[in-house]
Swiss-Prot record:
It is a multi-pass membrane protein. This is Uncharacterized protein YqeW. One of its GO terms (cellular component) is plasma membrane. GO terms for biological process: sodium-dependent phosphate transport. It comes from Bacillus subtilis (strain 168).
Length: 307
């Protein structure tokens, strides 16, 4: 029981750290992030690139999609203009996973203590920088905690059952990644936990790649929930996010086992292998779909016609 409580607490702290990092970055970078975002949506390539940047700042594709759906619901952004932004936000979300894959155990306390001192100054931009440092320190502390709990978790019946299904087949691993991400509303937390288990040699690379693919689908749940009370354009935007991610996974999943050898060569570090795979998957699928935005727009209109 204590292990499960500790694991749950680490997830909550990880989410809190992500929120602190996001707030600090937004405060330092842009005072009116939403208004500035609208200036760059007049061309698909510009919308694609700016969504990568803003998702990197927000540290969350879910948060970015909630903002986008809010604009669509308000009628200041058309559904068609959101399609390249959906492609870009998936790429931008991989910045977080690349960052947390770096081994930074030795600087955790430097980030926490330094962040606290900066925060206590109460001065701009030191306070905002301190908030980001504190958030980052908490994230790396949680990653370290997940690694320490990975072994004990496998000895629990629930943990053993989940790991059995993850390692049983790619489909099971994909489903678990999708459900876990949908429950905690953060693909970064899901992949952070996955990296910790990989570092302990508990999960194989191919199965871990499947979890990443599932996480890409599960992360869409926040956008779908945000669009429930919106109009048809908002619903089209949310479901376009789902359809794009499902199609991307469907394209890659049949070749996953064959791609494992290539991913194996990307880095000697297990966590970085997963981070690099997530980046490559999202970049490749985004570049494949970007020239097809008009076709994709018509497809969504067929699936969810406006009334």
């Amino acid at each position: 029981m204590l292990i499960l409580i500790s694991f749950t607490a680490l997830i909550l702290f990880f989410l809190a750290g992500m929120n602190m990092l996001r707030k600090g970055l937004i405060s330092m970078a842009y005072s009116k992030i939403e208004e500035r975002l609208l200036l760059f949506t007049d061309h698909p390539l510009k919308a694609f690139l700016i969504s990568i940047v803003f998702t990197g700042i927000l540290q969350s594709s879910s948060a970015f999609m909630v903002i986008v759906i809010g604009f669509v619901s308000a009628g200041v952004l058309s559904f068609k203009r959101t399609i390249p932004m959906i492609l870009g936000t998936n790429v931008g979300s991989t910045f977080t996973t690349e960052f947390i894959a770096i081994k930074m155990d030795i600087v955790i306390w430097v980030l926490l203590i330094g962040g606290l001192l900066f925060f206590l100054t109460g001065r701009y931009p030191l306070k905002q920088l301190g908030t980001s440092f504190l958030g980052l320190g908490i994230i790396f502390f949680c990653i370290s905690g997940f690694s320490h709990l990975a072994g004990p978790l496998t000895k629990l019946k629930t943990g053993a059952d989940v790991l059995y299904h993850v390692n049983d087949s790619n489909w099971s691993a994909l489903l678990i990644g999708m459900v876990l991400t949908a429950i905690i509303h953060s693909s970064s937390v899901c992949i952070g936990i996955l990296m910790s288990f990989m570092n302990e040699g508990i999960i194989g690379l191919t199965q871990a790649m499947s979890v990443v693919l599932g996480s890409n689908i599960g992360t869409c749940i926040t956008a779908v929930m945000a669009a429930v009370s919106g109009g048809y354009a908002a619903k089209q935007t949310a479901y376009a996010h789902v359809v794009f991610n499902v199609l991307g996974v469907a394209l890659v999943l049949p070749f996953l086992t064959a791609a494992t050898g290539f991913v194996e060569q990307l880095s000697p570090d297990p966590a970085q292998k997963i981070a690099h795979f997530s980046l490559l998957f999202n970049v490749v699928t985004a570049l494949l779909f970007l020239p097809l935005t008009n076709l994709f727009y018509r497809l969504i209109h067929l699936l969810i016609p406006a009334k």
